[in-house]
A protein has these predicted regions:
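Phosphate- and other anionic-substrate recognition elements at nucleic-acid/protein interfaces
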Residues: 1-16, 20-150
Length: 150
């Protein structure tokens, strides 16, 4: 069976906004070029919720994974950059899927703006912020894919 390419209409991505306490998850396809928030996972820096991540991988059956890379504004690394890279590497090794690391600078600010514009009350931001940040990261990735937009 030939390998799928990013232009395949069924090429699905699962994206993660990695944090030490919460991990936002989003899904999107190369065909629709649209990312959607899925959920926010709780975990710790050393022990993400691998059971729920495995369930999500099994449910969505992505062809590739996307992880946000929290760089400093000048493009340099920081401790969270290294942690996100390590998380991405663990995902790649566990699930044997291609991994794309994507610059996520300002994604949380964009996510906060999206929630405000959608009228989501501030008290509900915490539960939605990370998954909308993952959506923002994945949307930026999908926007950069080669080929025509739908």
């Amino acid at each position: 069976m030939p390998a799928k390419s990013v232009s395949d209409p069924n090429f699905l991505y699962l994206a993660f906004d990695y944090g030490e306490k919460y991990i936002g998850v989003a899904v999107g396809s190369s065909h629709s070029r649209q990312a959607e928030p899925v959920t926010t996972l709780r975990g710790s820096a050393k022990n993400p919720d691998w059971v729920r991540i495995s369930r999500l991988i099994g449910e969505w059956r992505p062809h590739a994974l996307v992880v946000g890379l929290p760089l400093n504004m000048d493009g340099s690394d920081n401790p969270m950059t290294r942690a996100a890279r390590a998380f991405g590497q663990r995902l790649k090794e566990r699930y044997n899927l291609p991994l794309h690391m994507v610059d996520e600078r300002l994604s949380t600010l964009v996510a906060r703006d999206v929630l405000n514009e959608a009228g989501v009350p501030m008290r509900r931001h915490k539960s939605r912020l990370d998954q909308v940040a993952a959506q923002t990261i994945l949307q930026a990735f999908l926007n950069e894919l080669p080929g025509e937009s739908p």
